[in-house]
Amino acid sequence: MDAIGVEARPPVYGRVIQWCLRFVGRVGHLWVENPWILGAFTIRLLLAWRSLLFDLSPRQLNRTIWSFISETARTFVPGLFVVLGLSVTLGLGTGAVARAVGPLLQPVFASVVMTVLLRDAAPLVLIVFMASRMGGIIAAKLGSVEGIPASESPVVSDQELIRVALPHLVAGTITGAVFFSLGAYCIVLGYVSLGDPARFLTASPDWFLELKPIQSALWFGVFKSMVFGHLVALVACALGIASRERGLRGARRVADVQNAVWETSVGSILVATLLSVLLWLAVEAPLR
């Protein structure tokens, strides 16, 4: 029996080839199919706006507004304490570094390091958090049976597409702006207090916020965070609904939803990083 089992086992090079083929398939799925899914979903969403603009009764308007509020609250409240804890920790750490460089180098630290931190680093850290938490939840919800009501059609209708996607897009945009504002304020407080916990809540950051480079960095950081939050929700809705439609057309597999959750996080971070580089090349680099 052992000899038969050994003979039936595929050779090592066969397993290596199978692993390489699975890896190539996963990479191709991430870099080829998912961008196509995202582009097609965006076009469908833009075309579906007609059903919202021309068939918006008062009852439907109230239901839509309430869905915006409820989805934003569900997205914002659970992550609030996590973002607050990370922001306070990052703020105190930034203040400790500013105190360590000394008073002579603190103006350079404020004009260079703080500007890059608020304008570039903080939005990217925020999208990693939002993609791993909010994006995964949206993709799992929309890809599951409970996410979208059952239908005989293998394609989600325009009305249903707007109904399930729009609240998540609005919630992602608002949550990105609010979370960044909270994090940026804690970072500024940490710098002004020089990392002293006793002065962290009593320090006044007004003089620091009046500096023009800091104001520009804050506004650009808010803009980036809103775009990134919207992007996370868009990718999650696209991959989640695509997984749902694959299940409507054929046998539903748990792996489809799992892949949608994983690829939402990875895809959102990749697209946001690429967009951040393009924004830096188009807007920030020419100003230097």
Residue ranges and their predicted role:
Residues L118-A139:
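Long, hydrophobic alpha-helical segments
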Residues W49-T72, L80-F81, L92-V108, P286:
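Helix-loop-helix hairpins and the membrane-proximal interhelical loops
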Residues E7-S67, R246-A251:
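Short, membrane-interfacial amphipathic segments enriched in basic
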Residues P78-A100, S268-A282:
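Hydrophobic alpha-helical transmembrane segments of multi-pass membrane transport/permease proteins
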Residues F76, L80, L84, M130, ...:
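Selective transmembrane-helix segments that form parts of the transport pathway or gating/packing helices
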Residues A96-R119, V178-H230, L234-V261, E284-R288:
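Membrane-interfacial helix-loop-helix connectors in multipass membrane proteins
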Residues V145-A203:
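Helix-loop-helix junctions within the multi-pass membrane cores of secondary transporters/permeases
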Residues F68, D158, I162, R252-V266:
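Membrane-interface segments at loop-to-transmembrane junctions
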